[in-house]
Regions:
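Short, acidic, small-residue-rich periplasmic hinge/interaction motif at the N-terminus
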Residues: 38-45, 82, 88, 93-129, ...
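Periplasmic N-terminal accessory/gating domains of Gram-negative outer-membrane beta-barrel systems
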Residues: 143-146, 170-172, 184, 202, ...
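Transmembrane beta-barrel wall of Gram-negative outer-membrane proteins
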Residues: 336-360, 376-420, 438-460, 466
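C-terminal beta-signal and adjacent terminal beta-strands/loops
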Residues: 362-365, 767, 776-798, 815-883
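Face-selective signature of the C-terminal outer-membrane beta-barrel domain
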Residues: 398-416, 439-593, 608, 612, ...
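Surface-exposed extracellular loop regions of Gram-negative outer-membrane beta-barrel proteins
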Residues: 417-419, 424, 470, 537-538, ...
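Outer membrane beta-barrel strand-and-loop segments of large Gram-negative receptors
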Residues: 503-505, 555-559, 645, 649, ...
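Gram-negative outer-membrane beta-barrel transporters
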Residues: 676-678, 700-784
């Protein structure tokens, strides 16, 4: 078997070969005369030229390529300074001799003496909602910018008339002629496109083709609501699971394992506030309600300096502000959950609100079932009751003090509750046994966010944030028998365990755009952390006849820490081909009298080979001061978070990434990326059997180790009038080493060598669309015994046991499934919209491996393993009404 490094080196060679072939496949050169350019425009743009033979169309053309310019821009570029005038009439371009005038001067390079002014403002949709990552492009000078996380843009241009194009994916472009003779405030409203989207990213500065970062993916509401939805409920995390380089972990769970990292190595931000518990129903649903999600920026490499605190990924989720002009909303009913969303003005044009509530109703379905079962239970049968539900509540109030000043109050409250009860009346045997339990876990986040336009070039944001995370387990056992007196017996026990995190702090961030070629971001934040990993109370009362014994215990672990971060980054456009994003993130983490310091440099560079081909590379370092202690690979209420202590080092990673991004035509977008990441001071809890590892002196019960993760990722996207295709493939290796656990490198549990996704969506018209997605990846790894040993007789018959060698030494069978669904949209005469969704999970009912049963075959002296799968085909339905 060839080593993994051979395949990785082979992949790098193929990547470089792809670059060379792609570059060589481009046209060798454009036509060299104006006439040849006219012939090319005639063929490609389907236009005809009418002109006198005496016109100098044979002169050499020395201007830029016309290939990717719109017709009006191509014509003005072609005939500029040629002595030829033109006018367009339908499909004809009529040429004439230009009137004598002073020859046009060549463009002057920008200098301090050139008058420059700043165009700035907000880009919004027709509901008044700001648009993140919208593109603002000056077709006159060929420079542009994008809106920030608050929809604000700033573009400094030479004095004079400019043609500005405003664009956003899924919206109609808007062009405005701006006479710039001083600083100009221009707020722009874009209308949602009525036509189906096509991949036209040449002008989208946030597209993978044109942005500087590697490993960035931006997801809007349309991406979330048009992709596959498990149980017909769109989900942020499950959408991200389909991205190349991301493993989902356990089936049906909203796990996120990025470039070999653990689930606690992802930074989840909700309106800039960290979120610790990101799942409901043990991971079946994520905590993000897509009814209020405006934009998701996902980074798996090339992290900008403004982010820090986690090793593997950043998920930056922004929510909608609310309509400033009219009240509207939606109601959704799904198989297991539903929700309502409402937004509108509190004061027209000044203050808006946006609220959304989502709740599961599994408890409403199971409650009558258990009532009927318990009513019909026999005298000797237990009466059982199980109740579970979750809810999310999002609320946001936004107020505009002026065109320059805005204040927003955001709140999120998410909670899961699981109650169980088991009662045995003894069936006439003279005893009673009652057991109860309550599990409660969730988040409460709130932030007060103030933004202010200091000047047309300078944007400021100041926020106060508070985060509360809770996991609480309570259980009771009550057993009694006999009559009260000397012959009676009773046992009573009660256990209460609670884990909490309280974070309070502030952050200040600033955007400064001195020129179109520089976008400076800098800021800092401070957070006070209060961790309570475990606080438990235990009461035990034993009554035997006339005696009574009571035992009571209390344990608590508390840690406080302060964290300070500062960052600075600059997005630099060196020229029309080279762009650079460089910066540094500095952090101080103080705990138990010790201060940890980190300085993480970040750098990303892009070379724009042509408007349709770019090359990128990046290097980032990340430091992480918090860890999640868990005994399973699903989110359980027994998991808890702890900070780095004076006994341990913060986790640290270095990551290199490089890739090629190309758009062969307006329908296709292709990318190929390679990455290599090495991590140090990773943690692994020593062997523990039970629901919750003890938090008392937890830092003495973990092993420190390191990781090595590398791979190649290919992505393809195609969109035409009715058809949309997406495909991705990942080839990766994930290895870890913990010397105190196993002295050599071993594969990670989610070392899925191959991962492939392919999806298709077809719009039939009249609001009907059909979609399907096929998912494949190599099986997760398992640790299986290699030997079965009989230990010698020590006086009581001896014993037998399994012996283990390398951790994660076996791969489970490959995982694959097909999901299909159909959407039906209907708009009523009064403008309301009805949406029906039918979907099928695991359409061909392939039972993928959930666990493996291991047995010793004594006849053959070998170990036998059999995989077990339990998740079958799952149909679902949802109905949404928008009003």
């Amino acid at each position: 078997m060839k080593p993994a490094h051979f395949y990785y080196k082979l992949g790098i060679v193929l990547l470089l070969l792809f670059v060379v072939v792609s570059a060589s496949a481009r046209p060798k050169g454009d036509p060299t005369t104006i006439k040849q350019q006219m012939e090319w425009l005639h063929k490609t743009k389907k236009i005809n030229f009418t002109y006198d033979a005496s016109l100098p169309v044979g002169q050499v053309y020395r201007g830029p390529s016309l290939k990717h310019l719109p017709l009006d821009k191509a014509l003005s570029t072609l005939f500029a300074g040629s002595g030829i005038d033109y006018r367009v009439k339908g499909k004809y371009v009529i040429l004439s001799k230009a009137q004598r005038s002073a020859p046009p001067l060549p463009p002057k390079p920008a200098s301090a003496s050139t008058a420059r002014h700043t165009l700035n403002g907000f880009v919004r949709d027709t509901d008044g909602e700001t648009l993140i990552n919208a593109t603002i492009w000056d077709e006159t000078t060929g420079v542009g910018t994008t809106t920030n996380a608050y929809g604000f843009y700033s573009l400094t241009l030479p004095e004079g008339d400019h043609l500005i194009k405003y664009s956003y994916i899924g919206y109609e472009d808007k062009k405005l002629k701006e006479p710039l003779h001083g600083n100009l405030r221009q707020d722009v409203t874009l209308s949602e496109s009525k036509s189906l989207p096509e991949v036209v990213v040449v002008g989208d500065l946030n597209s993978p083709l044109l942005n500087t970062q590697t490993g960035k993916r931006s997801i809007g509401p349309s991406d979330l609501k048009t992709g596959y939805a498990l149980l017909s409920s769109p989900d942020v995390v499950k959408t991200l699971q389909q991205v190349s380089g991301v493993a989902e972990g356990v089936e049906l769970v909203s796990g996120l394992y990025v470039h070999g990292g653990n689930s606690d190595e992802n930074l989840f931000l909700l309106d800039g506030t960290p979120l610790y518990q990101i799942n409901h129903t043990l991971g079946l649903f994520s905590s993000f309600n897509v009814d209020v999600v405006k934009n998701v920026d996902f980074y798996k490499s090339g992290f900008p300096a403004r982010y820090g605190g986690r090793l593997s990924s950043v998920v930056d989720v922004r929510t909608t502000d609310g309509d400033m002009h009219r009240v509207h909303g939606s109601v959704r009913f799904g198989l297991l959950d539903g929700g309502i969303q409402l937004e509108g003005p509190l004061q027209k044009g000044k203050t808006s609100f946006n609220i959304a509530l989502r709740r599961s109703w599994l408890d409403l379905l199971t409650r009558p079932i258990f009532a009927i079962v318990n009513k019909n239970a026999g005298a000797d049968e237990d009466k059982v009751n199980v109740s579970y539900f979750f809810h999310d509540f999002n609320a946001k109030i936004t107020h505009l003090f002026s065109q320059r000043s805005r204040l927003a109050l955001s709140t999120y409250w998410g909670q899961d509750r699981l109650n169980t009860k088991d009662e045995d009346d003894g069936g006439g045997m003279g005893y009673r046994d009652l057991s109860k339990s309550r599990f409660n876990w969730g988040n409460f986040n709130t932030s007060l966010d103030w933004t202010y336009i200091v000047s047309p070039k300078f944007f400021a944001n100041i926020s106060g944030v508070y985060t509360y995370s809770l996991s609480k387990l309570w259980s009771k056992e009550d057993f009694s028998s006999g009559e009260v007196g000397d012959g009676s017996l009773s046992n009573y026990s009660e256990h209460d365990n609670q884990s909490t995190i309280n974070d309070i702090g502030y952050r200040a961030s600033f955007d400064y755009r001195p020129t179109p070629h520089h976008h400076l971001r800098f800021g800092h934040d401070f957070t006070f952390h209060h961790y309570r990993p475990q606080g438990s109370n235990h009461i035990y009362i034993d009554k035997n006849g006339g005696r009574s014994d009571t035992l009571q215990s209390h344990t608590a672990s508390r840690l406080t820490a302060t964290e300070w971060n500062a960052y600075a980054e600059d997005e630099i456009r060196l020229n029309h081909r080279w762009s650079l994003n460089g910066g540094i993130n500095v952090a101080l983490f103080h705990i138990q009298g010790k201060t940890f310091a980190s300085a993480d440099p970040r750098a990303a560079i892009k070379f724009q080979v042509s408007p349709r081909l770019s090359l990128k590379a990046s290097y980032t370092t990340m430091t992480q001061f918090v860890h999640k202690i868990s005994n399973a690979y699903i989110d359980l209420p027994s998991d808890y978070w702890v900070p780095t202590t004076r006994r341990l080092h913060p986790m640290h990673s270095h990551q290199w990434a490089a890739g090629i991004y190309m758009q062969p035509d307006k329908h296709w977008l292709l990318s190929l990326e390679g990455y290599y990441k090495c991590s140090s001071h990773l943690l692994q809890y020593t062997n523990w059997i039970g629901l919750q590892p003890p938090a008392d002196s937890w830092d003495t019960k973990v092993n420190e180790g390191k990781g090595r993760f590398f791979g190649l990722e290919f992505d393809a996207h195609y969109a035409a009038h009715r058809l949309q295709l997406d495909a991705s493939y990942t080839l990766s290796w994930n290895k870890r080493k913990f010397d105190d656990y196993y002295p050599h490198w071993f594969y990670d549990k989610f070392d899925n060598r191959h991962k492939a996704n392919a999806s298709v969506r077809y719009h039939f018209g009249k609001g009907t669309s059909l979609y399907a997605e096929w998912i494949y990846h190599s099986g997760n790894r398992l640790t299986l015994p290699t030997q079965y040993v009989n230990f010698p007789d020590l006086g009581e018959g001896g014993s037998q046991d399994f012996l283990y060698d390398v951790p994660n030494n076996v791969s489970a069978p490959a995982y694959h499934r097909l999901d299909i669904g159909v959407d039906l949209h209907h708009r009523t005469k009064n403008g309301h919209e009805r949406i029906w969704n039918w979907s099928i999970y695991n359409a061909y009912c392939h039972l993928n491996t959930m666990w493996v049963d291991v047995k010793y075959d004594s006849d053959h002296g070998t170990m036998r393993a059999k995989s077990k799968g339990y998740i079958p085909i799952i149909p679902s339905f949802s109905y949404t009404f928008k009003f």
